[in-house]
């Protein structure tokens, strides 16, 4: 589900499933919806669920053990609203060409998932004149620098 569309995603999954399909949880980095408790974003419920999991699953370390943590970065590149579409069109080819070893997904921007588990997502802001870069990698600075160069060139071409 794309960022900003949690409720639409919940409805889509329910409609696509069978009569017994349940969506237990939907989230963005700053929004958590526990559908059994309601259709609203609920941080207090998230705290309660996490507390229960910590108590029943052997502590926070046990919950975190299967997760590989990598540095994460979000960066914004200035881009006039009227240039976003052209910049993103160019990035559909340019970003994968720069990171050819990765798998590409263009559902919600341009995302490249790399064999080492790192990833970069480039998408236009829906509210501000920026193209956003989101990345997670052991060397996140290098990945962001590479993406920034590609995004900067696409924005420059789109504004000229």
Spans of model-derived segments:
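Phosphate-binding and adjacent anionic-ligand microenvironments
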Residues: 1-134, 140-141, 145-160
């Amino acid at each position: 589900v794309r960022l900003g569309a949690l409720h639409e995603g919940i409805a889509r999954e329910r409609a696509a499933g069978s009569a017994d399909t349940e969506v237990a949880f939907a989230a963005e980095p700053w929004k958590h919806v526990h559908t059994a408790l309601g259709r609203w974003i609920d941080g207090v419920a998230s705290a309660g669920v996490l507390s229960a999991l910590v108590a029943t699953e052997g502590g926070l370390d046990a919950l975190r053990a299967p997760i590989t943590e990598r540095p994460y970065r979000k960066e914004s590149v200035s881009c006039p609203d009227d240039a976003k579409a052209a910049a993103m069109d160019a990035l559909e080819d340019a970003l994968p060409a720069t990171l050819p070893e990765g798998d590409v997904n263009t559902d919600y921007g341009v995302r490249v998932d790399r064999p080492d588990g790192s990833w970069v997502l480039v998408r236009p802001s829906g509210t501000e004149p920026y193209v956003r870069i989101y990345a997670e990698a052991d060397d996140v600075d290098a990945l962001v620098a590479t993406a920034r160069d590609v995004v900067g060139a696409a924005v420059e071409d789109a504004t000229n």
